[in-house]
């Protein structure tokens, strides 16, 4: 098992500990271990595997373009338009719905058009005082991982079939710019090329 101590998770849970019946959005796949852990802590959890949804959406768009006769709107659709269209059916939640968001390493995989739009949406669905936990690779990872919670300060990295190509390595300044609307941030640097960022609305 590939388990790492997560100071970011520990602090994320501490920040949410005074919210009764807090709502958490997990942007990874459904893991029973994560669901059980959060339910035992009396949180309500919603899961939306955003990276898989994005991949499936792109595959569907490519197929649609492939079968569209040339001349019938056959030009290549822009990345901006794709991002906009994707978010018409994804991350559809009321404003201030969640007290915490587990974003994992999603931002490393999104393109420059989708990323700010996702960030804008997450900011709107996050309750004031709510927190986002995100992971950033300080170099391209050797393999694609998914993440699940083991306990209050540990996460397990699970090797998985590659869903998307690692798009970028963020510099610290870029991370702060991405989360510019948030009122505070804290970074935890691990020895395994993985940085954790905790961002408070």
Regions found by a protein language model. Give the residues of each.
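Gly/Ser/Thr-rich loops at beta-strand to alpha-helix junctions
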Residues: 30-31, 108
